[in-house]
């Protein structure tokens, strides 16, 4: 029976795992949970592991290993011979099979009925269920777990080892290629439901033949009980001549598996877990060199660890050198042409490509220095280093596009037409570009503005149809620099980030010092002024000082939460009429009160910073008055685009204030510049002149204020 007072949990462990720490994990389940539910909860336990990233619910299965028996052998000598042969095969297999299985026997030679333990003769990582030889033909689960036979011995046929089905690789462990045939069961005492307590039915009769009498290994009493359990749905997969896998179906109830294998709830120890079989193995062999495509090949961590154990010769050619650990999201794939890679000889025949794969920045610098030293030798062929970014797709055909020429026409100049120039400038990398050692190493991804500047540079101006410059084919000459015409647009492509980002004032409300440093460093880099606040109340006080256009508000703040701080700011804006269209008289009165000196006429943009993806948190942030929200960790490249967007929105909403700021700057320059004062003939001429100022200039709205007074 199952103990209802205990938590229902089952121990699971990953089979054939390359991790050094592979401990059993307890997974709780209910009476209606199936094997699929156990898989989902097991994935939740390992949500942050690499094993979880490469596996899914359809690629794993729950089961265990079981031994194969020769049921036709009745004498003891033959049984011992078969056991020894299977034991020797298991030990000889080594890590090829990598059997990491359940252990339910104390001795593999003559275990007693119902005993569980580990076979001493087996390897530490190869534990196979061992049970006594049955005296009659029974089902596979009975042989593996000493379970009760479901049918009579005359109707139950053993599953031949040579006909053990193999699972389909397209749908691994999710379907049943071959199952044991379903048969009718004897009308014996059984469980009518998954309740921990058995129920008797009127149609059940306690009648069992002597051949089917069975003493349960989980029953501590000594009397015989003809108790039969519900048959389990499972498939088998042959591992070797002595062992096969038992894989439970996804729709099988977990409670039926537990009481069939372990009996009462809580009787399964952590040393006897069920196994998680996976068809995606973390340990993969390095593919042969002759079938390896360097452009599309990205080494895995296991391949790199295997290469570390082997001696590495940096001077060898045509050998892959995986010298450093490279993880996803780090340095891109770097491919280097070998020391003696002569792509096109003097006779015109192409030689085989020789290359080295480099993933270490220091080794890349050494290779660059070697190429630089070889330049002094005039007879050595020209070398190059090709840097490929992570995720690069496509081939690199060196035969159709030779990098260097060694013939006599090396220094001859050819004419490049305007159409060819467009093709060359549109490509991400120039074939005739010089080697730049300063740019070798880990490079940051370019922003959109930088990428546009790289595509069209001042050295490649816009040409008319009458201008056809001449260029050199030399590898180490500057591209497009020979006899080029004067640049018709000298300052067209000298844009910087200072002109891209709007002039806004930002308030960072964050209690985390690390997040403050990251955002502050980003804003300082782009010349954006900002202030810091550690809690919501401090943010409200700083906002009341005025001059802010954008607020990054963290929702989880001490003293006053981000949501409450946003509500107070919006309420204060309503009380002061910020964001409400007013007439000229009202704006004139506000200017006299001095309110517009501190606050702009546009409401501040509040962006919520949240670490949760919950729609409820985002909804609360928007209802509190936030204009937008960002989920941590914030992508800085994406943040730069959003700052430009929010700054443009603020400029469009409060266009008069932005124009007023530009006019203040202009008036300040005019006041500081030395000019001869002109005395007006009429004392009211200044007022008349100011009244004729166009109405679209907000600086002249108040005719009683001079330009110097407005500046103050």
Swiss-Prot record:
One matching Pfam family is Response_reg
Remaining remarks: Present with 1200 molecules/cell in log phase SD medium.
What is the similarity comment for this entry? Belongs to the SSK1 family.
Gene name of the record:
SSK1
The record ties this protein, via SMART domains, to:
REC
The organism's place on the tree of life at top rank:
Eukaryota
Query: In its keyword annotation, does this UniProt entry include Cytoplasm?
Result: yes
Main localization of the protein described in the UniProt heading: cytoplasm
Q: Entry's PROSITE patterns?
A: RESPONSE_REGULATORY
Location of the protein in the cell: Cytoplasm
GO CC, any one term:
cytoplasm
Q: Where is this region: Disordered?
A: 73-114, 340-362, 448-468, 672-712
Positions of post-translational Phosphoserine modification: 110, 195, 327, 351, 368, 380, 673, 703, 706
Comp. bias intervals (Polar residues): 87-113, 682-712
Keywords on this record? Cytoplasm, Phosphoprotein, Two-component regulatory system
What are the Phosphothreonine sites (modified residues) in this protein? 693
Key word Phosphoprotein present: yes
InterPro entries (UniProt xref) = CheY-like_superfamily (IPR011006), Sig_transdc_resp-reg_receiver (IPR001789)
Name of the protein in its database record: Osmolarity two-component system protein SSK1
Q: How is it modified after translation?
A: The phosphorelay mechanism involves the sequential transfer of a phosphate group from 'His-576' (H1) to 'Asp-1144' (D1) of SLN1, then to 'His-64' (H2) of YPD1 and finally to Asp-554 (D2) of SSK1.
Where is composition skewed (Low complexity) in this entry?
A: 74-85
Molecular function terms in GO for this entry?
mitogen-activated protein kinase kinase kinase binding; phosphorelay response regulator activity; protein kinase activator activity
One GO term of the biological process aspect: regulation of p38MAPK cascade
Assembly and partners are described as: Interacts with SSK2, SSK22 and YPD1.
- Disrupted-gene phenotype: Increases arsenite sensitivity.
Q: Which SUPFAM superfamilies match?
A: CheY-like (SSF52172)
């Amino acid at each position: 029976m199952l103990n209802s007072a205990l938590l229902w949990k089952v121990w699971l462990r990953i089979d054939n795992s390359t991790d050094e720490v592979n401990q059993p994990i307890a997974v709780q389940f209910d009476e209606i949970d199936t094997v699929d539910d156990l898989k989902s909860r097991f994935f939740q336990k390992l949500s942050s592991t690499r094993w979880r990233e490469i596996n899914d619910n359809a690629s794993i299965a729950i089961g265990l290993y079981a031994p194969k028996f020769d049921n036709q052998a009745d004498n003891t000598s033959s049984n011992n011979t078969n056991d020894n042969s299977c034991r020797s095969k298991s030990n000889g297999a080594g890590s090829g099979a990598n059997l990491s299985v359940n252990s339910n026997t104390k001795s593999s030679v003559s275990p007693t009925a119902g005993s569980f333990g580990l076979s001493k003769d087996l390897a530490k990582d190869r534990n196979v269920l061992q049970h006594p030889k049955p005296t009659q033909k029974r089902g596979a689960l009975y042989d593996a777990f000493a379970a009760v036979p479901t049918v009579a011995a005359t109707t139950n046929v053993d599953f031949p080892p040579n006909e053990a089905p193999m699972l389909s690789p397209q749908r691994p462990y999710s379907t049943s290629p071959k199952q044991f045939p379903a048969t009718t069961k004897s009308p014996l005492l059984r469980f009518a439901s998954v309740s921990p307590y058995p129920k008797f039915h009127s149609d059940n009769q306690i009648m069992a033949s002597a051949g089917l009498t069975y003493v349960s290994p989980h029953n501590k009493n000594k009397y015989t009980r003809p108790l039969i359990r519900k048959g389990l749905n499972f498939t088998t997969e042959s591992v070797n001549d002595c062992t096969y896998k038992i894989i439970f179906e996804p729709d099988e109830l977990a409670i039926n598996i537990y009481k069939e294998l372990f009996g009462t709830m809580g009787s399964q120890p952590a040393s006897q877990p069920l196994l998680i079989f996976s068809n995606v193995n973390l340990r993969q062999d390095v593919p042969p060199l002759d079938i390896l495509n360097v452009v599309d090949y990205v080494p895995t961590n296991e391949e790199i660890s295997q290469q570390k154990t082997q001696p590495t010769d940096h001077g060898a050619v045509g050998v892959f050198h995986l010298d450093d650990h490279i993880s996803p999201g780090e340095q891109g794939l770097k491919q280097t042409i070998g020391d003696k890679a002569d792509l096109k000889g003097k006779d015109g025949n192409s030689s085989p490509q020789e290359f080295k794969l480099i993933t270490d920045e220091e080794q890349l610098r050494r290779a660059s220095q070697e190429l630089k030293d070889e330049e002094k030798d005039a007879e050595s062929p020209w070398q190059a280093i090709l840097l490929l970014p992570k995720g690069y797709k496509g081939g690199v055909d060196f035969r159709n596009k030779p990098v260097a020429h060694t013939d006599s026409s090396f220094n001859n100049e050819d004419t490049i037409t305007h159409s060819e120039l467009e093709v060359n400038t549109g490509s991400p990398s120039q074939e005739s570009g010089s080697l730049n050692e300063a740019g070798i190493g880990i490079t940051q991804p370019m922003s959109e503005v930088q990428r546009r500047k790289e595509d069209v540079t001042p050295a490649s101006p816009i040409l008319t149809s009458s201008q056809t410059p001449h260029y050199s084919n030399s590898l180490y000459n500057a591209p497009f620099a020979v006899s080029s015409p004067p640049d018709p647009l000298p300052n067209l492509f000298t844009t910087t980030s200072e002109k891209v980002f709007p002039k806004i004032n930002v308030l960072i409300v964050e209690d985390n010092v690390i997040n403050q440093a990251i955002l502050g460093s980003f804003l300082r880099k782009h010349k954006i002024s900002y202030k810091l606040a550690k809690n919501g109340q401090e943010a409200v006080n700083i906002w009341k000082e005025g001059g802010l256009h954008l607020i990054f508000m963290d929702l989880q703040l001490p003293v006053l939460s981000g949501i409450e701080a946003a509500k107070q700011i919006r309420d204060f804006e309503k009380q002061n009429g910020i964001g409400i269209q007013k007439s000229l008289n009202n704006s004139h009165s506000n200017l006299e009160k001095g309110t517009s000196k501190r606050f702009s006429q546009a409401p501040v943009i509040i962006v919520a910073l949240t670490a949760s993806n919950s729609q409820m948190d985002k909804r609360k942030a928007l209802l509190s008055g936030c204009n937008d929200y960002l989920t941590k960790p914030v992508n800085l490249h994406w943040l730069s685009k959003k700052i430009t967007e929010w700054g443009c929105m603020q400029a469009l909403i409060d266009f008069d204030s932005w124009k007023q700021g530009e006019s203040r700057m202009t008036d300040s320059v005019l006041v500081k510049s030395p000019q001869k004062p002109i005395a007006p003939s009429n004392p009211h001429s200044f007022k008349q002149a100011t009244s004729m100022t166009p109405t679209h200039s907000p600086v002249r709205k108040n005719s009683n204020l001079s330009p110097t007074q407005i500046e103050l």
